[in-house]
Amino acid sequence: MQCALYDAGRCRSCQWITQSVNEQLSAKTADLHRLLAGLPVEQWCAPISGPEQHFRNKAKMVVSGSVEKPLFGMLHRDGTPVDLCACPLYPASFAPVFSTLKPFIARAGLTPYNVARKRGELKYLLLTESQFDGGMMLRFVLRSETKLTQLRAALPWLRAQLPQLRVITANIQPVHMAIMEGETEIYLTDQQALAERFNDVPLWIRPQSFFQTNPTVASRLYATARDWVGQLPVRHMWDLFCGVGGFGLHCATPQMQLTGIEIAPEAIACAKQSAAELGLTRLHFQALDSTQFAIAQGETPDLVLVNPPRRGIGKPLCDYLAQMAPRFIIYSSCNAQTMAQDIRHLPNYRIQRVQLFDMFPHTAHYEVLTLLRRSI
């Protein structure tokens, strides 16, 4: 992938950009083999990759510069701003949004936040696009509610220019730290969720719910999990760390009893909306801590699917799963190192299948899906 920002030395986020996609896949596969060394694997499935550019459905832009000439991108450690509007990871549909937002910021009087001076209001712009219908969600991350009236007054102009903006919010993040968002979300549109669809499964994206940033590869990840579960004798399943329900909604059947657990209420609201659309009455989602939920249960499902954050599921949940002993575990991980550690805490399970998904091209990161079967 060619990138003028990288060539000019202005951005180094894509550290592997000089390598071909095949070289990147080989290096990631070797890393996964190294991390799982000593753990017998019955089947290594071929890695899955997608487009090498224009694949991201989300932009997280630091806003700097002045209200008349804002910059969208990032700040180097020395505070130097870099405009990333031309980043080739973003789809072409983002460019007109960025170019329209720059004069809008002046029109609304949203002074960019100055980190050194601790002054200004607009900290970040968070833009998400649906691959289903091209609808977009835009979040203005503000230091306070001071400019909220001005923002509301200017919105009709913005929505006339960019009708694809279906969901618009103001997120209030008052802390002088590099934190992307605060707890308070103020909706500026009637619509509060963005419609998405993977493999004919309806999904919803709300402002504070996690959603994969590479929809092409994510849709194949969910489809693969569905295929694996479909080959197993599963009538009762848990989906832990379920997010908006992508895995559970793909794997569920009308006959299956499935419980999805996620600590973020916004994500659970999305999952419940999707389940209602699909008419799956035996599928239940709850906003709880996944580990606490599992430990409190007195029943054992046939399969437990876990999709934890980078820290992994941790030893307490591993110990409980080992004690509870479901017949199958599917582990989806964005950090193979912690996944490998967790699997080693499950001595009574054997790895039946492993598949790498190149969710993050041009970086060392990848997603991995692993099927574990109880051996005793």
Swiss-Prot record:
GO terms for molecular function: 4 iron, 4 sulfur cluster binding; iron ion binding; rRNA (uridine-C5-)-methyltransferase activity. Keywords: 4Fe-4S, Iron, Iron-sulfur, Metal-binding, Methyltransferase, rRNA processing, S-adenosyl-L-methionine, Transferase. Catalyzes the formation of 5-methyl-uridine at position 747 (m5U747) in 23S rRNA. The keyword Flavoprotein does not apply. GO terms for biological process: rRNA base methylation. PROSITE patterns: SAM_MT_RNA_M5U, TRMA_1, TRMA_2. It is an enzyme of class 2 (transferase). It comes from Salmonella newport (strain SL254). This is 23S rRNA (uracil(747)-C(5))-methyltransferase RlmC. [4Fe-4S] cluster binds at residues 3, 11, 14, 87.
